[in-house]
A protein has these predicted regions:
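Catalytic cores of carbohydrate-active enzymes
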Residues: 1-2, 103-104, 115-119, 125-213
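Short, flexible helix-coil linker/hinge segments at the edges of structured domains or between repeats
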Residues: 94-114
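Residue-level detector of alpha-helix boundaries and kinks
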Residues: 43, 77, 111-112, 146
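Residue-level detector of functional hotspots within protein domains
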Residues: 44, 58-60, 104, 110-112, ...
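Short loop/turn segments at secondary-structure transitions that flank enzyme active sites
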Residues: 65, 110, 167
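Aromatic-rich carbohydrate-recognition surfaces in CAZymes
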Residues: 3-99, 120-127
Length: 213
């Protein structure tokens, strides 16, 4: 119907392959290595932080694949894949300011703006990506010190998710969708102004692109 690919939906549909279809899963991993990061377009700059969780898809899929099948040869035969995953995490690590928590920003989730300055689900993806690449780094490539660094960063991110991205609810502690800051008064409220835009200004350009034939 349209020339567009919904990366988030494709990622979700690829997850069962990490348990059932190793050959197909490997093709998906290589696909996300090539297309997972939004390219520069006419409406958006693209890049790793356009949708951080989409950019991390290749790492999370790789981690799930290795966790279940334990195949080292695939990664050893694709050194550029490992290099690409390391580069993605390095870009993210370098984005954090010294006075910031160990949480990371994103503009979009997939087809909607991420809620808050720091989006909870995206940072859970960061934690998972740190842990996934740490295991591959150590067990496949023997990079123990690098793996230890990633696990350390994962621990810091997990700690700050629990510290800043939770609130007391009717049934106890619950996770927030996102937070506009780390101060208590900014955790549970955010301005709706930046989310109140016309449909065509929100990146949903496919609406005018449908092939009615």
């Amino acid at each position: 119907v349209t020339p567009h690919v919904w990366n988030k939906d494709m990622y979700y549909s690829s997850l069962p392959f990490t348990l059932t279809e190793p050959e197909l899963c490997k093709k998906c991993i290589l696909w996300f290595a090539k297309y997972g990061i939004k390219y520069k377009g006419t409406k958006f700059e693209g890049g790793v932080f356009h949708s951080l969780s989409n950019s991390l898809s290749v790492i999370m899929l790789s981690g799930a694949y290795y966790e279940y099948f334990g195949e080292k040869e695939f990664f050893q035969q694709h050194p550029k894949l490992y290099k690409k995953m390391k580069a993605i995490l390095q870009t993210v690590l370098e984005s954090r300011e010294e006075n910031e928590p160990y949480l990371y920003r994103t503009t979009w989730i997939s087809d909607a703006y991420a809620l808050g300055k720091y989006h909870t689900g995206t940072n859970l993806c960061m934690y998972r990506s740190f842990m996934a690449l740490a295991r591959i780094a150590e067990e496949v490539f023997g990079e123990k010190s690098y793996a230890e660094m990633l696990r350390s960063e994962a621990g810091k991110t997990r700690k700050d998710i629990e510290r800043y991205m939770t609130a007391k609810g009717l049934f106890g502690t619950q996770y927030l969708e996102g937070i506009s800051g780390i101060a208590e008064e900014k955790k549970e409220c955010d301005s709706a102004e930046k989310y109140q835009k016309e449909m065509l200004d929100q990146g949903l350009q496919f609406i005018t692109d449908v092939n009615h034939d």
